[in-house]
């Protein structure tokens, strides 16, 4: 028993040392979200800067627009590395590219997600924010596969929270 506890403490310490957090969120009796967030590592990415009104800012990470900052004046603090949904015990990966600073605490919570069932598919709605740079993502889930259909800062994509 003592050895098991020591091993668990060692694993948790190791993960925290490298800035990795993960967890599970229960959506309903048949649906769960599994997530993994890592500390942002500048050595693993490429960067492009833009200039607007004499303001230089980080506009692209790995040649793509990125989400999680109001203007890209700083590097992201962390990165959403993995997101999966389990529906009726079928685990389905969700696209997480371009998604940074998903929450101020570095963890995700049930209140950030809503799963809606339609006739032949589901839509998973989510919002992410670390206090600045809020964005919304929507995934269509059908036949054991997912497609991210929205990744946006536009207000219209947050309206699902008002329903």
Language-model segment annotations:
Residues 2-10:
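Sec-dependent signal peptide recognition
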Residues 10-18:
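Hydrophobic h-region of N-terminal signal peptides that target proteins for export
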Residues 20-163:
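Exposed acidic/polar residues on beta-strands and adjacent loops within beta-sheet cores, strongest
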